[in-house]
Amino acid sequence: MNDSEFHRLADALWLTIEERLDSWDGDSDIDCEINGGVLTLSFENGSKIIINRQEPLHQVWLATKQGGYHFDLKGDEWVCDRSGETFWDLLEQAATQQAGEKVSFR
């Protein structure tokens, strides 16, 4: 994968997160902000989830209250380089915990 392909895929990931939060009808308010390639989800309790791209490594990084995760593209799925869990699974787990209610991005 070259840098432009990586950015296209990361942009698509950011857009999907935004669209799914816009259509989410939960009780909690989750704000989504993109600034300089960093996507920040802010929760009512003041906690945050930070998602950013690491261009030199062609990775997506996820920072949550539970810890930090690094994802490589495997086929059409972003997969954690340590646990093998998917980006969507770990994002949903973290968002659900930080929102205090089930959050789904699928």
Curated annotation (Swiss-Prot):
Q: Does the keyword Iron apply?
A: yes
Enumerate the Gene Ontology biological process terms.
iron-sulfur cluster assembly
Please give the SMART domains that the UniProt record associates with this protein.
Frataxin_Cyay (SM01219)
Instruction: Please give the coiled-coil regions recorded for this protein.
Output: none
What SUPFAM superfamilies has UniProt attached to this entry?
Frataxin/Nqo15-like
- Write down any Gene Ontology CC term: cytosol
Q: Which top-rank group of organisms is this from?
A: Bacteria
**Which PROSITE patterns does this entry report, sorted A to Z?**
FRATAXIN_1, FRATAXIN_2
Q: Which family does it belong to?
A: Belongs to the frataxin family.
What function is annotated for this protein? Involved in iron-sulfur (Fe-S) cluster assembly. May act as a regulator of Fe-S biogenesis.
Please name the PANTHER family in this protein's record: FRATAXIN (PTHR16821), FRATAXIN, MITOCHONDRIAL (PTHR16821:SF2)
Q: What is this protein called?
A: Iron-sulfur cluster assembly protein CyaY
What taxonomic classification does the UniProt entry list for its organism? Bacteria, Pseudomonadati, Pseudomonadota, Gammaproteobacteria, Enterobacterales
Query: In the UniProt record, what gene is named as encoding this protein?
Result: cyaY
